[in-house]
Amino acid sequence: MRLPITNRRAFLRATTALPLVSLAPLGATAFAQGLAGYPARPITWLVPYPAGGFGDALSRMLAQKLSESLKQPVVVENRPGAGGQIGANFVKQQPADGYTILYGDIGPLSMNAGLYPKLSYDTLKDFTPLTRLLVSPTLLIVPANSRLRTWQDVVEAARSTKGLNYGSYGTGSQPHIWMEMFNREIKGNLTHVAYKGGAPAVQDLMAGHIDLMLDVTPSSIPLVREGKVRALAVVGSEQRLPQLPQVPTVGELGLPGLNVPGWTGALVKAGTPEAIANLLHDELVKAVQSPDVVQRYTELGLQVAPSSRAEFGELIRTETSRWGKVIREVGVRLD
C-alpha cells in the first residue's frame, strides 16, 4: 500500500511568478532574522523510548552529525513510558525555539491518537514535522525449532481450535495491532501475549514460550542469520529484503493490504520559527544520508527515506487516519 505524498510543484509555480530580484534579499533577511544566532546553546534530542533500541542508536548517530554541522552539542535524552506519551508531552511543554527535537515512530506520532481517548497531545497541532528518517519493515518470526515451517503452516495452525500464541512489544504497539489485523484477515484464533518491550518477547519466542511474533529487522535479521529464529514473511516492503532473499513478502503471500511499513521521523514544537525548522530539516536530511548512516541501517534491513516537511506532515495525517480506523475495527483502547 503506497501512501499519498505531496510535492512542491504548486509552490514553485506560485513563487516563479514573483519578481526574483525582490525575493532574494527579502528571503535572506527573513531567514537571518528567523535564525537570530541559532543555535547558541546545546540542543536536546528527545527519545520517548528506553536506551538501547535501534531508535536510540540512530538518534545518537544523528545527534553526533548535528553536533558537528551546527557547532553545538546535541544531547540525547530518553524519556520512555505510556507508549511514547511522556516524551512527546515533555517536548510539547518546551519553548518553541528549536532547542528540543522529538524523535518518534508511527506509535506516538500516529497510532496513539486512536488508542488513547484522552491523549494529551495532537501530533499535527502541537508539533511541526521536520522530516521522515527511516522506513522500517518487520519480520514475522518463529522459534528455530518451531513446527511452523511456512506461512501456510501459520495460517492453518492459527485457524485450528487450539490456535497460536503471539507476542508483542506491548498492548497497542504496532506489532500487536498488525497481528490483530492478520488474525481478522485469516479468521484465525490467535491469543495475544503482551510484553514490556521487544527484548523479553524475543527471548520468550526463542525459548518456545510463544509461537510467533512480528519484530523489527534490526533485532530479527541477526537472529535469523545465527539460526536462533526463522523468518516466514516480510511486512512493509514491496520487495524481498536483500539480507534475506529467501523470505517472501506478505504481498507475495496474497495479503497486500497487510503490507504496511513502520517509519520514524523528527519534529519540533509547533510555533518554532520557520527558518529554524527549515535549517533543522536540511541538516537532518544531510545527516541521515551520510554514507556511514546509510550503510549501517541498510545492513539492518531499514530504508533511509528523508522527506520534505510537507511530505512528512501528510504522512502523519494519512497514517493517523488509517491506523485510527484499524484500531477501531480490532477494538483496542487504552486508558
What do the predicted segments below correspond to?
Residues Q93-Y99, G114-P200, V250, W263-Q295:
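Hinge/capping helix and adjacent helix->loop/strand transition within the periplasmic-binding protein
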Residues Q33-L35, D126-L130, G251-G257:
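Short beta-strand/turn micro-motifs at beta-sheet edges
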Residues S220-Q289, T318-S321:
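C-terminal lobe and pocket-closing loops
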Residues A63, S67, K71, K92-A96, ...:
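Sec-exported extracytoplasmic/periplasmic mature domains
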Residues F31-L124, K187-D211, V216, L223, ...:
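N-terminal (or domain-start) structured segment
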Residues M1-P25:
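N-terminal secretory signal peptides
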Residues Y38-P42, G188, R225, E274-D335:
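An extracytoplasmic/periplasmic, membrane-proximal ligand-sensing/linker region
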